[in-house]
Amino acid sequence: YLYFAHHKGAFIRLAYADDLKGPWHIYSPGVLDVSESLFAPTDPPEPPPDQRPSWADTLPGGYLYAHVASPDVHIDESGKRIRMYYHGLLDDGDQKTRVAYSQDGLSFVPQTPLLGPPYFRVIRYKEWLYATTWQGRFLRARDWDGPFEVQRDPGPAMRLFGPDSPLEPRHPALWLKGDTLHLFFSCVGDCPEQIYHCQCELGDDWDSWVFTKPRILLSPEKGWEGSDLPHKASVLGTATS
C-alpha cells in the first residue's frame, strides 16, 4: 500500500501493488474522507484578522480550503493495525495533525487529540518518538498517540532553518539508520524546488544534536519533473501551471 495526498484533497489517496516494482493500481474510493477526518469538512469563512494563523499572513489568500493531506503511515505489528498521521484544516484556518487507525488499511478511525503542526514525519529512537513538522521543528513523545512536546528554540533543526537561514523548509522526510538520522526536505522560495539532505548522529539529549550542512540531493531533470517549466520562485500553497 502507498498512501499519498493531493494538496487540496478531499480524501487520502491509495495505490496498491503485489510488488514494489509494480504494476501499481489506484484504489479509486480513496481512504479517510475529509468528512470523517474530524477536521473542517467544508471551506470555513475567513476569520477576523486577529484570529488568522500567523503563517497565513504570508499568503495572498486562498488558504481556507477543507482538505486532508500528508499521510505518514506506520505498521503497528503488536496491535495488528495501521497507524496514519495526517493533517487538516481547523475552523479558524490553522492546520494541525491527528492520528487515525485501521485494521485493514482501508477504513480508518481518526482520534480526536490535536498532536501538533502539519506534515508530521515520525521515527522511534530508543525510548522516544520524534517528529519533524512543517518549518523543520522537532517534537517528541513517549507514545504514538502523544502528547508531543515541542523542542525549545533554537533546537538543532531550527539552527538550520532559523531567522538567519536562507532555507525555509516545506515538506520534510526522515530516515533513521542506526544512530544516524537523515533529513530530506524541500524549500519554499526555491527556483526551481529541489530536494535537500542533511544528517546528524543522535544521542539521548536531543538539544545536543547537530545536523550537517544541507546539500542539494535532487533537482528537476526530466520534463515530468518540471524541468521544462519557466523558473519561478515557489510559494506556499498549491502548484499551478
Predicted regions and their residues:
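Beta-rich carbohydrate-recognition and catalytic domains
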Residues: 1-70, 74-170, 175-241
